[in-house]
């Protein structure tokens, strides 16, 4: 493919990404893969170049553009040499005078008032920097120092005692340490959420929104003698956990829940859990550096829906915590409505509960929780709070 043809291909891919973001369809990665499966003539250099163009355009545009062409025209505004490719054979049509171009922005304009007040303008760029690859060592089987010997490019993560940081383009799925269940891919921020739970041998722990089980596995590694129940309403995600647990040597019970009947399906855990972790569904605004198109998918209506889900999950979790037990709430979000404001709302309705400072390194106090961000902590952005039920 010529450079002009690559540019045209990027426009075609971005058209699909824009439509998919609007309609809550497949992510950009999947769209790029599908595009080239249908075009076997494209070589590896072509695929790499088109993918890079697509994600540069996505990172540049905070708002969902009207079209893939608008996204690329906007990118060309920043890189004048690219304009020369418009109008070339197999390339896009020439740019017209005054043609609409996607504006450059870090975040959607409508979201700015929703940000935590701790987020300064100077942190916006870090929200979209490429994230490193973080590993979590399975400390039930090995130590970080021992595992680090097998990763010459790795360094200890500064905040999590379990973490190893690798360059962003590292591959680990074929590494002997991965095959042996000694490491899992997990951002340092997610590791800190597990640390905030302070799991102990003998604890009864419920991971209410376990997904594919990354944090449940971290809890099991930190406290092999704990009894862990991992639940979720997404069958596809939860079904991945048993194989992961087997590889890690972890004993974790899984249970598929059916909203809105979660409490009935968890009756055997009511007021019996030492720890309940609510790693709630959220806007994903803290993970934009890994998923920049998430900015294109989020709308005010979707944010309202997810905030309501978070409120409901917190209320369910409160019913499971034993007297004297602890509830840990976390979201990979930098928006106040999903973080500090959620805890304020919960405590308004549960005034006897006690707010505790999560026992983690890093972050800044944000209401009655802590906020970590890429710009301040070099982790994904997330909010975490810990609450204790009165005895």
What is each PLM-predicted segment?
Residues 1-391:
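S-adenosylmethionine
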């Amino acid at each position: 493919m010529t450079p002009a043809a690559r540019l045209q291909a990027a426009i075609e891919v971005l058209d699909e990404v824009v439509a998919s973001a609007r309609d809550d369809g497949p992510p950009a990665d999947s769209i790029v893969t599908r595009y080239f499966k249908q075009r076997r003539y494209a070589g590896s250099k072509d695929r790499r170049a088109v993918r890079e163009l697509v994600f540069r355009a996505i990172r540049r545009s905070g708002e969902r553009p009207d079209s893939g062409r608008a996204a690329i025209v906007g990118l060309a505004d920043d890189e004048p040499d690219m304009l020369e490719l418009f109008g070339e054979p197999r390339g896009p049509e020439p740019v017209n005078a005054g043609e609409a171009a996607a504006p450059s922005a870090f975040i959607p304009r409508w979201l700015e008032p929703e940000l935590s007040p701790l987020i300064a303008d100077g942190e916006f760029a870090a929200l979209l920097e490429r994230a490193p690859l973080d590993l979590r060592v399975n400390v039930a089987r090995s130590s970080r120092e021992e595992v680090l010997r097998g990763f010459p490019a790795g360094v200890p993560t500064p905040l999590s005692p379990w973490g190893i940081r690798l360059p962003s383009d590292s591959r680990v799925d074929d590494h002997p340490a991965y095959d042996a269940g000694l490491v899992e891919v997990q951002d340092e921020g997610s590791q800190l959420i597990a640390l905030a739970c302070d799991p102990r041998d003998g604890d009864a722990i419920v991971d209410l929104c376990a997904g594919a089980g990354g944090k449940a596995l971290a809890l099991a590694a930190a406290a092999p003698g704990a009894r862990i129940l991992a639940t979720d309403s997404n069958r596809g995600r939860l079904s991945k956990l048993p194989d992961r647990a087997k590889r890690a040597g972890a004993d974790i019970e899984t249970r598929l829940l059916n909203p809105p009947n979660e409490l009935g399906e968890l009756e055997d855990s009511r007021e019996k859990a030492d720890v309940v972790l609510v790693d709630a569904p959220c806007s994903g605004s803290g993970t934009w550096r890994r998923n920049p198109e998430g900015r294109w998918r989020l709308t005010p209506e979707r944010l309202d829906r997810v905030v309501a889900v978070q409120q409901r999950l917190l209320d369910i979790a409160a019913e499971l915590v034993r007297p004297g037990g602890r509830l840990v709430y976390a979201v990979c979000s930098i928006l106040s409505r999903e973080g500090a404001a959620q805890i304020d709302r919960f405590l308004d309705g549960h005034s006897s509960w006690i707010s505790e400072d999560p026992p983690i390194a890093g972050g800044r106090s944000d209401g009655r929780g802590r906020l970590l961000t890429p710009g301040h902590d070099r982790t994904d952005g997330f909010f975490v709070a810990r609450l204790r039920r009165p005895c």
